[in-house]
Structures are given as C-alpha cells and as structure tokens.
Amino acid sequence: IIGIDAKFGKLNLAAKYEFKANMNIENDTHDITAPDAAADFMAPYQNGVNTPSDLPAMLSLAASYEILPSLRASVEYHFFDDKNAGMADGKQKTLKHGTHEYLAGVEWDINKLFTVSGGYQKTDYGLSDAFQSDTSFSCDSYSVGFGGRINFTEALSLDVAYFWTTYSDYTKENVRGLGASIDKDVYSRTNKVFGVSVNYKF
C-alpha cells in the first residue's frame, strides 16, 4: 500500500494505492449429492477445486475542506481494477471496465454535545451479460446515509447511523433463446443498514 496525506490550511488532500493481492480459494467439500446429469454444473464445488479470487488493485483519491470550524465537507473517488483481478472462469474479462465509486459527505457539529452527518455513494461496476449468473452477480447502485454522534464527555460518545442502498436491476433478455418477452433473468437486491456504536478514548 502506498499513501500520501497533505494538509493545506483548511484543505486536506489524500491519495492511496493498494496493489493487487493474488488469492486462490480451495474447496473443502465433504459431501455432494446430485444426479449424474448435473456433474458439469457441480464440478466447481467438488472438493479440492481451486478458484481464483484476487483482491483487485485499488486507487483512492480524496479531498476534504473545513468550511467552518463546525462544518466539514469531503469528496472521494475509488477505482477497483476488477478487469485485471482473477475470478472464477476468467469472468473478469467480460467486464466493460473496472469499478468506479463516487462519494461525498458533510459533517456538522451542532454544538459540543451533538454532531450530525450525511453522505452519498454511487457505484458503477461495468457489468455485462456474461459476467452475471445465478450464483454470482452484482448491481450498480447508489447509497444515502445519515448519522449522529452524542458526546457525553471528551472520552465517551455514542454513534448512531442508518443508510440504504438502491440497486439498479440488471436484466438479461432472451436468455433461453425463446424469443418471448418473458424469457429474461432479472438480477436485483436491496440493502438497509442501521448501526450503533459506543466509543471511548483512553
């Protein structure tokens, strides 16, 4: 990992690059029960099979600015080089491009007791029909989140946060060659997260 962080008065700039990590996952399968006709479909799950699962190289660029002593804003960009990270059956080659993430956030200290924040993230995976399958798929998305902090003392604080992600459905048309409007696969998901944490500085 290579990183740099520079502060120019109220402006803070940072960059980080993480190199690709080559990984292989080996199955530890104890039992598979399936008809002989399904042997080809079950082959990837047999005991001892190795599947490439690289962690892609990642570039992160960020900037934050102190608008007021109590108000801060930041923007950030991430790029994950998924097209050059090994995946099962080399499916990374079917991606149109690596993953792009765009983020922005604002944090406001209302007073010494309360702090509130909000953020936004948009993710674009560069998906293709060949990349998507019933056992592994992704969906482009955007997320919106809000949070708050209560500072009980200089050492003790409580954080509460909630965010939801809206995913774009991915549709594969005429998957079975039937030429019918119902011949399609739709990949979809939803996500909502609520978090609470207690922080103590020693």
Predicted ranges, named:
Residues 1-202:
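Outer-membrane beta-barrel porins/channels
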